[in-house]
């Protein structure tokens, strides 16, 4: 498992980011919350990660805090909630707002 990645942002959209580290570009799917909390293209960033492997894809998910990452893991443990739904939930509110 990859716990976190630290590198330079080379591409960024509201739900996806590319981080370059040691000449390799890593694509990470992110929530809108994470997108708002990190820098812009050219900035250094540290994202906590979850690697999900399925029959169709290998996807790396990135989070601006380990707290958000752990909450994502909690969400996807709920039956019927997959990674995409969990990211949408995290995009709508902060972890603190969801808990309250």
Regions found by a protein language model. Give the residues of each.
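Long, highly charged, low-complexity intrinsically disordered interaction regions
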Residues: 4-6, 10-100
